[in-house]
């Protein structure tokens, strides 16, 4: 009989929720105030997810353009969690702003109302981004992650679909907090979170005592896909194959070292499919089409994010201090008025 896995604790912001009143994190006790959806006129459907349908809408009281996320029937507890987290994070750097919580007067279906972002589909956008653009948007995403982590919240579904970018205005927002959760040390969490290509190794080996560092793996996957122009970077056919794809890059020996450190027992199915793989050098992924996006600093940052051992990954704040972002920090420390001009000028010059 396998023994229990070893414990683990976040390297940063571990006690944030224990230092706050219970009201802050006890989302099950939260009672959202539901307004009337009649204030909002749906204009067009923007998309649908597993848990919701999303529409562009107009607030008829002030003519403001908004996004309305109509929630599909799920447990009340899940809706309360999303609302509580969005309320706690309201006003946070690059976090999508929750404007209102409403219900359809007839069906009583709950809906969340958000600020509108003129998003460019990432599949098109990522093809035209310059080296500087990638640094800029990754830095903006790190601001959002450091903010939510500092508030005791893991996003748990970081991926391109959940990062809205208005490229004209150079505006980024982290959206879809439906899988987000409060971090409490030693709590065991559901591993059925995040989307396959962005799932950290901890999820794929069923290690439940994970933390904010899960989001840093997902961000690393996004960075890899952007600089190498390979979307997604780890392209597994299922959750088992996903770990195999990771092992083919990071190596199997290193994986076994991780499992040993945390006393993790691997699902026997992996014995048939893992094989033996040596660790690959990041330089192996450079080719003529992506060379202009890759630099030694980019590879160094990537290497410090895509680590099996979640405790070894850079935190959001540490990542922001990495030399890869020096050009962005330098630009953002210029007088404000010049920023947008400077940024577009740099983009045009490349």
Swiss-Prot record:
Its EC number is 2.7.11.1. GO terms for biological process: apoptotic process; cerebral cortex development; DNA damage response; double-strand break repair; liver regeneration; negative regulation of apoptotic signaling pathway; negative regulation of proteasomal ubiquitin-dependent protein catabolic process; positive regulation of protein targeting to mitochondrion. ATP binds at residues 46-54, 69. Residues 40-325 form the Protein kinase domain. It catalyses: L-seryl-[protein] + ATP = O-phospho-L-seryl-[protein] + ADP + H(+); L-threonyl-[protein] + ATP = O-phospho-L-threonyl-[protein] + ADP + H(+). The lineage of its organism: Eukaryota, Metazoa, Chordata, Craniata, Vertebrata. Can use both ATP and GTP as phosphoryl donors. Phosphorylation by casein kinase 2 has been estimated to represent up to one quarter of the eukaryotic phosphoproteome. Constitutively active protein kinase whose activity is not directly affected by phosphorylation. Seems to be regulated by level of expression and localization. Belongs to the protein kinase superfamily. Ser/Thr protein kinase family. CK2 subfamily. Pfam families: Pkinase. It comes from the Eukaryota. InterPro entries: CK2_alpha, Kinase-like_dom_sf, Prot_kinase_dom, Protein_kinase_ATP_BS, Ser/Thr_kinase_AS. PANTHER family: CASEIN KINASE II SUBUNIT ALPHA. It is found in: Nucleus; Cytoplasm. This is Casein kinase II subunit alpha'.
């Amino acid at each position: 009989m396998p023994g229990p896995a070893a414990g683990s604790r976040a390297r940063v912001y571990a006690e944030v929720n224990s230092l706050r009143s219970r009201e802050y994190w006890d989302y099950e006790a939260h009672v959202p105030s539901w307004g009337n959806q009649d204030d909002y006129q749906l204009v067009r459907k923007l998309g649908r997810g597993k848990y919701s349908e999303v529409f562009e809408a107009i607030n008829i009281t002030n003519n403001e353009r908004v996004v309305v996320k109509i929630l599909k029937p799920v447990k009340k507890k899940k809706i309360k969690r999303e609302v509580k987290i969005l309320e706690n994070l309201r006003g946070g750097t690059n976090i999508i702003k929750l404007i209102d919580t409403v219900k359809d007067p007839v069906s009583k279906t709950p809906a969340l109302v958000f600020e509108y972002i003129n998003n460019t589909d990432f599949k098109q956008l990522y093809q035209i981004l310059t080296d500087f653009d990638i640094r800029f948007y990754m830095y903006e995403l790190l601001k959002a992650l450091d903010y939510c982590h500092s508030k005791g919240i893991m996003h748990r579904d970081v991926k391109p679909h959940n990062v809205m970018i208005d490229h004209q205005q150079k505006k980024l927002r982290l959206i879809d907090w439906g899988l987000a959760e409060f971090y409490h040390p030693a709590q065991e969490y559901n591993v059925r979170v995040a989307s396959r290509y962005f799932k950290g190794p901890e999820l794929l080996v069923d290690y439940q005592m994970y933390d904010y560092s899960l989001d840093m793996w997902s961000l690393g996957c996004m960075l890899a896909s952007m600089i190498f122009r390979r979307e997604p970077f780890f392209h597994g056919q299922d959750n088992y194959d996903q770990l195999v794809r990771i092992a083919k890059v990071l190596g199997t020996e290193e994986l076994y070292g991780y499992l040993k450190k945390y006393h993790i027992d691997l699902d026997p199915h992996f014995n048939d499919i893992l094989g033996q793989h040596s660790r690959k050098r990041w330089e192996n992924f450079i080719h003529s089409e992506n060379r202009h996006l890759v630099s030694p600093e980019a590879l160094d940052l990537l290497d410090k994010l895509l680590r099996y051992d979640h405790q070894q990954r850079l935190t959001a704040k540490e990542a922001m201090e990495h030399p890869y972002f020096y050009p962005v920090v330098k630009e953002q420390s210029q007088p404000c008025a010049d920023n947008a001009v400077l940024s577009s000028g740099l983009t045009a010059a490349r």
